[in-house]
Amino acid sequence: IKQCLVGSEMCIRDRDKHIVTSYDNDLEYIKILIIEMGVLLEKQTFEAIELIKLHNLKIMPTIKETEKKINSAEKKIREYSTNTLTKRQPLADDLRKIIVSIKIASTLERIGDHAENIANRIEQAKIVPTNYLTDSIYRLGQSVIKNLSQALTAYDQNSITLSKNVSLEDKKIDLLYETCFREHLVLMMEDNKNISYFTQMLFIAKELELSLIHI
């Protein structure tokens, strides 16, 4: 997301050369759709992380329903953006803005897939060892949610500065992922009776890392 925003840094419209028309409304509508999709994704990711902490499988249907809404939102953004390109035949700067919007929507959809994968892995884990905590994974998930929120704010405000701050947070989350991975490897070696559970936790940590890469 942040790479798309930084890449469009030079796409600032020259108002002296561009008359405000319904086309501006199209651009604003696409932006609104992306923000709404981002809010859905934040909700889904939060629910997936809560599932890790609470292991309340009653949340599963909600997560899957949100995934459907996210997929539908991505399709709507892609189709509306494509139609706008066809109708308006935008100039270079606006053309890049629309292409960036399509890329961001696709990225958000992929992050949503990771959130659903996390929920599925929790479901597969079935039994949670009561004497072990998943605080490191939970903290990693919270950090990913925070980064996602910051990236969406950067997009909403068209702020290159905020997008660079997201990049700085990446390094901190990478360290947390490494810590989380090492902790669960140690637990796996110490308690091979629950190796299936810890294996799922390692996969979940990987899903969170992949989400971070997309952000």
Residue ranges and their predicted role:
Residues 1-12, 214:
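Single conserved hydrophobic/aromatic residue that forms the stacking wall/gate
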Residues 15-68, 77:
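Leu/Val/Ala/Ile-rich N-terminal alpha-helices, chiefly Sec-type signal peptides and the beginnings
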Residues 35, 39-42, 64, 68-75, ...:
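Generic structural signal for well-ordered, non-transmembrane alpha-helical segments
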Residues 45-48, 52, 144-155:
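Long, non-coiled-coil amphipathic alpha-helical linker/lever segments
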Residues 80-105:
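Hydrophobic/aromatic-rich structural module bridging two neighboring secondary-structure elements via a short loop
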Residues 84, 89, 162-211:
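Long amphipathic all-alpha helical oligomerization modules
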Residues 87-94, 127-137, 189-196:
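A cross-kingdom feature marking solvent-exposed beta-strand/loop segments within repeated
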Residues 103-124, 151-154, 163-167, 174-177, ...:
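A structural feature that tracks compact, well-ordered secondary-structure segments
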